[in-house]
UniProtKB/Swiss-Prot annotation:
Protein name listed in UniProt: Tripartite motif-containing protein 5
Enzymatic class: transferase
Residue list for modification Phosphoserine: 86
GO cellular component: nucleus; P-body
Subunit structure: Can form homodimers and homotrimers. In addition to lower-order dimerization, also exhibits a higher-order multimerization and both low- and high-order multimerizations are essential for its restriction activity. Interacts with BTBD1 and BTBD2. Interacts with PSMC4, PSMC5, PSMD7 and HSPA8/HSC70. Interacts (via B30.2/SPRY domain) with HSPA1A/B. Interacts with PSMC2, MAP3K7/TAK1, TAB2 and TAB3. Interacts with SQSTM1. Interacts with TRIM6 and TRIM34. Interacts with ULK1 (phosphorylated form), GABARAP, GABARAPL1, GABARAPL2, MAP1LC3A, MAP1LC3C and BECN1.
Superkingdom, natural source: Eukaryota
GO molecular function, one term: ubiquitin-protein transferase activity
Zinc finger intervals, RING-type: 15-59
Pfam families attached to this UniProt entry: SPRY, zf-B_box, zf-RING_UBOX
Binding site for Zn(2+): 96, 99, 118, 124
Originating species: Saguinus labiatus (Red-chested mustached tamarin)
GO biological process: activation of innate immune response; autophagy; defense response to virus; innate immune response; positive regulation of canonical NF-kappaB signal transduction; positive regulation of MAPK cascade; positive regulation of NF-kappaB transcription factor activity; protein K63-linked ubiquitination
Gene for this chain: TRIM5
Length: 494
């Protein structure tokens, strides 16, 4: 009975890492205790790049300052050593803890060494027993084979552990490189792509955290697996280096434990399955931005010129125009304009300006030669905004119908005995994924072109008039139509 108690006490004061009696024991918050040298070495080996520490047994995290010396356990170890070295205890080594007789037999059914009284007891009655000398060599060979197998598995486990760490480092480098590439691309469009860049980086951060989190967990699993194998190997080595009794004591259980050991491989993540960054047609955006930046070099200082009588009211700084109905006497015939011209007049060179049309449901802008008599009263009719009448313009009607106004197309209507010819104004529908709040107008007088840019959508081209015939000076043109919200000329700084 006393021997059994000593065994229990010895188990309580044995270090789970080195499997020897505790030396300078330190206790954690979770209640587990280890040798000072063992827990220090374990921390350095298992978490070389992290400040966080965890218990090797239960994995509970703990701060380093919470490691405290356990004098109570140290005293128990010293007393236990004294008892184990005493002559009385030495005489009991190799004796049955229950009967006090020598352990000379081995029970194959139970896999334990027993004494002759145990053999005759009800517990072992009918069991096949042999002398320990007869079975020692057999089990020594088995344990030797098991030891070699475990050593090989340990090597494989350590390689898998190293592979996980290498993969983790590779992922960090790959993610970091992806960040660098993404940021380099967005740098060219910083002002107009901040929102897209932020979204992509957030997705990438989430992917990195998710993958690395699982890889860290996989690494921890591999560390535990390796440590478990080390414990088994240490047990096998202890048995093989100890006495015959130590070799055979509980040997079947040890072998069964070893046979059930399976090497768990870490989870990996294939590059082919990861989300690859795809910029939203970045090349086209870069090209559009480049073209917009190029024409913005020719920014012209344009002001608005009042025209009377007119429904268009101009601000004091001559940079904004809005629609306002003017009351006049019905008996007096007056032609009212809906648009105004810009200044200066243009006879050569390249010129660019931008107009803010935010929230307007109707507007027309571009260039014109000058107001013509036949374009005054019926200026709201589309056929009046044709290049042949001196207008190169685009516009918005009814909130979302964008159009460019081209010269009329002639067609013939053949009837019985007669033929008539009519002109149909060509209104070109303009389709845009993002409606413009700000429109850029670029006139190249010598090239005879007028281009319109959607500044709101990264400067994509809205429409371009080619082969224009400028036989007279031309002017910037602005018409707020019947929408009371203003049209505003923008400054380069805005």
């Amino acid at each position: 009975m006393a021997s059994g108690i000593l065994v229990n006490i010895k188990e309580e004061v044995t270090c789970p890492i080195c499997l020897e009696l505790l030396t300078e024991p330190l206790s954690l918050d979770c209640g587990h205790s280890f040798c000072q040298a063992c827990i220090t070495a374990n921390h350095k080996e298992s978490t070389p790049h992290q400040g966080e520490r965890s218990c090797p047994l239960c994995r509970m995290s703990y701060p380093s300052e919470n490691l405290r010396p356990n004098r109570h356990l140290a005293n128990i170890v010293e007393r236990l050593k004294e008892v184990m070295l005493s002559p009385e205890e030495g005489q009991k080594v190799g004796h049955c803890a229950r009967h006090g007789e020598k352990l000379l037999l081995f029970c194959e059914q139970d896999g334990n060494v027993i004494c002759w009284l145990c053999e005759r007891s009800q517990e072992h009655r009918g069991h096949h027993t042999l002398l320990v000398e007869e079975v020692a060599e057999k089990y020594q060979e088995k344990l030797q084979v098991a030891l070699e197998m475990m050593r090989q598995k340990q090597q494989d486990a350590e390689k898998l552990e190293a592979d996980v760490r290498e993969e983790q480092a590779s992922w960090k480098i790959q993610i970091r490189n992806d960040k660098t590439n993404i940021m380099a691309e967005f740098k060219q469009l910083r002002d107009i792509l901040d929102c897209e860049e932020s979204k992509e980086l957030q997705n990438l951060e989430k992917e990195e955290k998710n993958i690395l989190k699982r890889l860290v967990q996989s690494e921890s699993d591999m560390v535990l697996q390796t440590q478990s194998m080390r414990v088994l190997i240490s047990d096998l080595e202890r048995r093989l280096q100890g006495s015959v009794l130590e070799l055979l004591q509980g040997v079947d259980d040890v072998i069964k434990r070893i046979e059930t050991v399976t090497l768990q491989k870490p989870k990996t993540f294939l590059n082919e399955k990861r989300r690859v960054f795809r910029a939203p047609d970045l090349k086209a955006m870069l090209q559009a931005f480049k073209e917009l930046t190029e024409v913005q070099r020719y920014w012209a200082h344009v002001t608005l010129v009042p025209s009377h009588p007119s429904y268009a009211v101009i601000s004091e700084d001559e940079r904004q125009v809005r629609y306002q109905f003017q009351i006049h006497q019905p008996s007096v015939k007056v032609n009212y304009f809906y648009g105004v011209l810009g200044s200066p007049s243009i006879t050569s060179g390249k010129h660019y300006w931008e107009v803010d049309v935010t929230n307007k449901r109707d507007w027309i802008l571009g260039i014109c030669v000058s107001f013509k008599c036949n374009a005054k009263w019926n200026v709201l009719r589309p056929e009046n905004y044709q290049p042949k009448n001196g207008y190169w313009v685009i516009g918005l009607q009814n909130t979302n119908n964008y159009s460019a106004f081209q010269d009329a197309v002639k067609y013939s209507d053949f009837q019985i005995g007669s033929r008539s010819t009519a002109s149909v104004p060509l209104i070109v529908p303009l389709f845009m994924t993002i409606y413009p709040n700000r429109v850029g107008v670029f006139l190249d007088y010598e090239a005879c072109t007028v281009s319109f840019f959607n500044v709101t959508n990264n400067g994509f081209l809205i429409y371009k008039f080619s082969n224009c015939h400028f036989s007279y000076p031309v002017f910037p043109y602005f018409s707020p139509m019947t929408c009371e919200l203003p049209m505003t000329l923008c400054s380069p700084s805005s």
